[in-house]
From Swiss-Prot:
Active site: 500
EC number: 3.2.1.31
Induction note: By ulvan and rhamnose.
GO term, biological process aspect, one: carbohydrate metabolic process
Compartments where found: Periplasm
Organism: Formosa agariphila (strain DSM 15362 / KCTC 12365 / LMG 23005 / KMM 3901 / M-2Alg 35-1)
Name the record gives this protein: Beta-glucuronidase
GO MF entry, a single one: beta-glucuronidase activity
UniProtKB keywords: Glycosidase, Hydrolase, Magnesium, Metal-binding, Periplasm
Keyword check for Acetylation: no
Keyword Ribosomal protein: no
Binding site for Mg(2+): 561-563, 581, 583
Length: 981
């Protein structure tokens, strides 16, 4: 009988092990719903008895800057939008936990708060977080009243950080990088669990690390999965438990499991390690991002006490200095975008429901992206999940501005970096930890690497800093070169990835120079624009930037186009209210550049005719077709215009002097003479009607106080086709329980949050927020000469009581499909091996000016001129090719000192000084050098070339650029040397 019982128990245990464990004592509440908010700093607002009855009712994600962003023209000069309300505000939330939860542990988790958050529970200060972008949490348990009302209070401050404000450490809280959209702008969760539990990955304050999951010995036949689980026992007695680990596949089946009996002493945390093996694992590819999940469960006396889920993706990868990026034995080129972690949306600011973040990711996936670099702070947890599910190799920073930081600033950054690793280390999409947006000191590099060694020793991830080339000794610490603007390879012994290329800007509303321009080219600020591109030019130039900077370079891993969506940060065009570098605008409506990159990057054969087909009679123009095919044919009204088998920059098929005719234009794409794909565009009729289309989350529009519904408004012809040249004002009315948030016009200040909006290129998009009351909402659109149209939405009630709901934020469900490999890739030139980058001609080099100077080798056209600006040499006499050279900060253009730059000639050599013609020539230049009569061009500035010969061992001293006033836009001189032969 005993034997029979034992067998039955074993059989029951085996059955339990193959069923996914889903229930336990743990509950995660969505803590976003029903907060009180005031846009001021009242005294004692943290007190439990403070009367907040008159405060505004809101739900998170929430920002108090949604009403004052995207509404000012850019200053240019790479500044972001700075005319936003800043100061201290308060949030309070009333909630009640069941009496039955007494004895449980309760933790609050903030995905992040901008910028400084002081958190209180029932009047007790729990702590402060200053990172603005990294999740953090607190233990509420000792201060809670179970079965009674509790008050969480959060004091939030979004004052501007600045490199130039003394004693203000938060340099990344600055509109240049991250517009200061203050508030609890990401999700908040409340976790309740048994005192015997798996910890949360919230290192700050809690000093807990959760699970650490990694795969080893990976092949197509098997993979070993190690799970390190941190278990905490806060019971008064020791506990004997069984840790169950289940590996669950994408279909929900348990494919591997293990049981481990462990004794957990009272009051202790323990790391328990288990190893399981998966047979015939599905591997994680960018084109097939297969995800498993790990279920960790604590059982005591066969009762499930606690469960915790972790993501798992199994992949081998290699960043190779000679052949680029490899994943699971496949060589691919990485292509995608840099994106701001604020991910701001016109009318909504940085406070977006998760499904809208997913909406943006789906667009990036549609356009063929497989790489994302978050700049220059960490993405939200939802966005990291999306990187996993859509197959985006991720370059992930902590928090950074653009500087080498010291003191308190570094302390905050380093603490945030450790928190980042602990929270995100299980995500397979993260391949590179970014130490910072600038080179670090050796001491800081050592700390960064120590953090990775401590918290992610088995992840095999690389570490790099953007602009690590500022310091020659970076190479001893970074394991990948993170480039900028694609021009240079400073470290031939390291693999290279591009973090920011193509910073050009163009608004969606300007089609081309043959179409109405909305007075763009006559705008009073147009002369101040760094870029004056139409949507057509911007689209076509995508191929130039991509192909020449990294696409055609076999050794290059690929890179991030800067950026995906227009936003109020770092713009250079004061005709616009955003930085207009995005492939989509600030409400995620695609520009022609979006479709251009889709035609370049999607694996399926693609053709895209750039622009529209609604021109005036007599128009002849160049038509561009973007395609990943080998050849393209173009037709107008079924008459062959031409065949092009010789694309520019790999993907641009150009057809000159195409005569417009009303009707159709069609492009056909061919590979190996076989027709693979077509696209047709038509001449639309006269504008005849307005059309409204609503977009909601995958589960509908939720009445949770923070959900968003989008409404597209189009001008269409009698056949319902969008009229591409339509513009003009549309007025809206709204009725029902909702808050109007509107949209924006890209070239008009103060266009957000209004009940009117201009159509741009035939379409625009507005947003409405839900409130806590469900019901029917009707939006009506009116435009003179058109019939009024309306769309009706229903906001759906959610189940929440006592301030709590278990309805978690919604996102799209990704249907996993295996994308094909590209059928055609443009031929790459032969690989050119890297060259040395250590100077032999400069000895004992020193530089005493402000900022940093560096020595470089192998000068050629396109190299950067300065350490602090993205200015390149665009015209260069041939004899300067392959020079060794000095790169200084341009910020010293008006700094004078006798010994600003000094070195000893390593060999007999030619010295060339390139000097801005608008600046008075300094004494040393006039005395010691001869004007060659040649000129170099640096982004439009003409620089005269001066020359002398120096003997080996000769000491060379160069003074400052000028001891008098110099023009505001002048350039610092630069120095090149070549061995005398």
């Amino acid at each position: 009988m005993t034997i029979l019982c034992s067998c039955a128990q074993q059989q029951q245990q085996q059955q339990q092990d193959t069923e996914v464990i889903t229930s336990s004592e743990r509950t995660t509440y969505n803590f976003n719903v029903d907060w009180k908010f005031i846009k001021s700093n009242p005294k004692q607002a943290q007190d439990i008895n403070y009367n907040d009855a008159t405060w505004e009712t809101i739900s998170c994600p929430h920002t108090f800057n949604d009403v004052d962003t995207f509404d000012d023209l850019s200053h240019g000069h790479h500044d972001g939008e700075d005319n936003q309300w800043r100061g201290t505000v308060w949030y309070r939330k009333h909630f009640k936990l069941p009496k039955d939860d007494k004895g449980k542990k309760v933790f609050i988790e903030f995905e992040s708060v901008r910028q400084i958050a002081d958190v209180y529970i029932n009047g007790v200060h729990l702590g402060q977080n200053q990172t603005g972008f990294i999740p953090f949490g607190f233990d509420l348990t000792p201060h809670l009243k179970f079965g009674e009302e509790n008050i969480i209070a959060v004091k939030v401050n979004n004052d501007r950080g600045d490199h130039f404000r003394e004693n203000f450490p938060l340099v990344w809280n600055h509109e240049h990088w991250h517009p200061t959209h203050g508030g609890i702008y990401r999700n908040v969760f409340l976790h309740t669990m048994d005192p015997l539990h798996i910890t949360l990955p919230l290192y700050d304050n809690l000093e807990t690390v959760g699970t650490y999951v990694y795969a080893e010995n990976i092949s197509e036949k098997s993979a070993d999965i190690t799970v390190e689980t941190e278990i905490q026992n806060e019971h008064a007695e020791n506990k004997n438990i069984t840790l169950v680990t289940q590996i669950v596949d994408n279909d929900g089946a348990v494919v591997a499991h293990s049981n481990k009996n462990v004794a957990i002493p009272s009051g202790q945390k323990m790391k328990v390690t288990t190893v399981t093996n998966i047979q015939n694992p599905q591997l994680w590819y960018t084109r097939y991002p297969y995800m498993y999940k790990v279920v960790s469960a604590i059982k005591e006396s066969n009762k499930v006490i606690d469960t915790y889920e972790s993501p798992l993706g199994i992949r081998n990868f290699d960043f190779n200095k000679d052949s680029g990026f490899w994943i699971n034995g496949e060589q691919i080129k990485l292509h995608g975008w840099g994106q701001k972690p604020t991910n701001a949306w016109a009318g909504l600011g940085a406070a977006l429901p998760d499904w809208l973040r997913d909406f943006t990711f789906k667009l990036m996936d549609e356009a063929g992206g497989n790489f994302i670099r978050w700049g220059h702070c960490a993405a939200s947890p939802a966005e990291v999940d999306m990187g996993d599910k859509y197959g985006f190799v991720t370059l992930m920073p902590g928090v950074s501005g653009e500087s080498e930081d010291e003191g308190e600033t570094w302390d905050i950054r380093y603490k945030a970096f450790k928190d980042l690793i602990v929270y995100y280390r299980n995500h397979p999409s993260i391949f590179i930890w970014e130490g910072g947006n600038w080179a670090e000191s050796e001491a800081h590099y050592k700390e960064i690497l120590e953090a990775i060694k401590t918290f992610d020793p088995k992840g095999k991830r690389l570490m790099g800093n953007r602009r690590a080339d500022v310091k020659n000794d970076s190479e001893g610490y970074v394991s990948i070169e993170i480039g900028t603007e694609g021009w240079e390879r400073e470290y031939p012994d390291l693999p290279i990835i591009e973090s920011e290329y193509n910073r050009e800007e163009a608004p969606r509303r300007i089609w081309d120079k043959n179409s109405p321009d909305d007075n763009f080219y006559n705008h009073p600020n147009i002369s101040k624009n760094t870029y004056k591109l139409s949507s057509e030019e911007f689209a076509v130039r995508q191929a130039d930037h991509w192909w020449n900077k990294m696409g055609k370079k076999a050794y290059h891993s690929g890179g991030a186009n800067w950026i995906f969506s227009d936003g109020p940060h770092g713009g250079r065009c004061p005709t616009e209210v955003t930085r207009a570098s995005g492939e989509v605008d600030a409400v995620r409506l695609p520009k022609e550049a979006f479709y251009a990159l889709k035609a370049m990057w999607r694996p399926e054969p693609q053709v895209h005719i750039v622009g529209h087909w609604n021109y005036e009679v007599g128009t002849k123009k160049t038509m561009y077709v973007m395609s990943n095919c080998a050849s393209v044919k173009l037709y107008v009204n079924d008459k062959l215009v031409g065949t092009n088998s010789n694309p520019e920059n790999g993907y641009v098929f150009k057809f000159d002097n195409v005569a417009w005719e009303s009707g159709k234009i069609k492009a056909e794409g061919f590979i190996d003479d076989a027709l693979k794909t077509t696209q047709t565009k038509e001449t639309t009729g006269e504008p005849a009607a307005l059309k409204l289309t609503s977009i909601t989350g995958p589960e509908g529009w939720l009445a949770d106080g923070s959900d968003v519904a989008l409404i597209d408004v189009e001008v269409v012809d009698a056949q319902g086709r969008r009229c591409p040249l339509a513009k003009g004002r549309v007025d809206f009315t709204i009725s029902g329980p909702a808050i109007w948030r509107g949209g924006y016009n890209s070239g008009k200040p103060n266009s957000t949050n209004n009940l009117f909006l201009d159509i741009e290129a035939g379409i625009n998009r507005v947003a409405v927020r839900s409130v806590l009351e469900s019901g029917t909402v009707t939006i009506m659109a009116k435009k003179p000469g058109f019939k009024d149209v309306s769309v009706t939405l229903k906001s759906l009630p959610i189940d929440f009581n006592n301030g709590l709901t278990t309805t978690l934020p919604q996102v799209y469900t990704n249907v996993l499909t295996k994308e094909p490999l590209p059928e055609h890739i443009p031929e790459m030139p032969e690989y050119i091996p890297g060259v040395k980058n250590r100077s032999e001609l400069f000895r004992k080099f020193s530089y005493t000016g402000d900022g940093k100077a560096m020595l470089r080798t192998n000068m050629h056209w396109g190299k950067k001129a300065y350490t602090d600006l993205e200015y390149n040499y665009t015209v260069l006499p041939r004899y300067l090719n392959e020079s060794e050279y000095v790169r200084t900060p341009n910020s010293d253009n008006r700094y004078w000192a006798r010994d600003q730059l000094q070195f000893i000639a390593g060999k007999k050599m030619h010295i060339y000084v390139l000097h801005d013609d608008t600046v008075p020539r300094p004494e040393f230049l006039l005395r010691d050098y001869e004007d060659t009569g040649d000129n170099v061009n640096v982004v439009g500035a003409s620089m005269s070339v001066f020359h002398r010969v120096a003997e080996e061992g000769e000491s060379i001293i160069m003074a400052g650029n000028s001891d008098g006033d110099a023009p505001e836009n002048c350039r610092m001189y630069t120095v090149m040397v070549k061995e005398f032969k």
